[in-house]
């Protein structure tokens, strides 16, 4: 008895903004055509982010790879045609148009690790880096500009060097109190 071919991960390009619908449609097509044995997971890797809008903290999801859907599958003519027949699928990424290349196990591991890390705590929608200019929009230092010195994503706080009366003064601020300058 021969061993079943191994399912590999492929990257499918979808219309931007329709990744979720493409993933759902693909799952439905797989069931409809009884091809569950050729397919594994179909996913759109996302992370939960927090943004401040109008003084309110809002959670939303941000896609790691906008415009792409990851599909675990055995590549053959039937599975290739099934994926290509799904509405809003533009094609596969990597390899040639008729012989797509799977992504490496190393890349898959990196994506899976990133997904596991994300599950713990939502990240801010805006990421800050040391040396970056920011504008304080709340608190006693509102309307002052400053330079980010340290970023603490665990506590969602920044240490910003604000210029007060010509002197740089380090100030601890919450992510919600600053915006990129």
Swiss-Prot record:
Gene3D superfamilies named in the record: 2.30.30.30, NusG, N-terminal domain
GO CC list: cytosol; transcription elongation factor complex
The keyword Nucleotide-binding belongs to this UniProt entry's keyword annotation: no
Domain KOW: from-to ranges: 130-161
Top-rank taxon, per record: Bacteria
Keyword set includes Transport: no
Biological processes, Gene Ontology terms: DNA-templated transcription termination; regulation of DNA-templated transcription elongation; ribosome biogenesis; transcription antitermination; transcription elongation-coupled chromatin remodeling
SUPFAM superfamilies cross-referenced by the UniProt entry: N-utilization substance G protein NusG, N-terminal domain, Translation proteins SH3-like domain
UniProt-listed InterPro entries: KOW (IPR005824), NGN (IPR047050), NGN-like_dom (IPR006645), NGN_dom_sf (IPR036735), NusG-like (IPR043425), Rib_uL2_dom2 (IPR014722), Transcrpt_antiterm_NusG (IPR001062), Transcrpt_antiterm_NusG_bac_CS (IPR015869)
Annotated keywords: Ribosome biogenesis, Transcription, Transcription antitermination, Transcription regulation, Transcription termination
Coiled-coil ranges per UniProt: none
Assembly notes: Monomer. Interacts with the transcription termination factor Rho and with RNAP. One NusG monomer forms a stable complex with a Rho hexamer. Binds directly, but weakly, to the core enzyme of RNAP. Also interacts with RpsJ (NusE). The rRNA transcription and antitermination complex (rrnTAC) consists of RNAP, NusA, NusB, NusE (rpsJ), NusG, SubB, ribosomal protein S4, DNA and precursor rRNA; S4 is more flexible than other subunits.
Protein function: Part of the processive rRNA transcription and antitermination complex (rrnTAC). The complex forms an RNA-chaperone ring around the RNA exit tunnel of RNA polymerase (RNAP). It supports rapid transcription and antitermination of rRNA operons, cotranscriptional rRNA folding, and annealing of distal rRNA regions to allow correct ribosome biogenesis. Participates in transcription elongation, termination and antitermination. In the absence of Rho, increases the rate of transcription elongation by the RNAP, probably by partially suppressing pausing.
Family: Belongs to the NusG family.
Domain notes: The N-terminal domain interacts with RNAP and the C-terminal domain binds either to Rho or to RpsJ (NusE). These domains are separated by a flexible linker.
Name of this chain's protein: Transcription termination/antitermination protein NusG
Biological source species: Escherichia coli (strain K12)
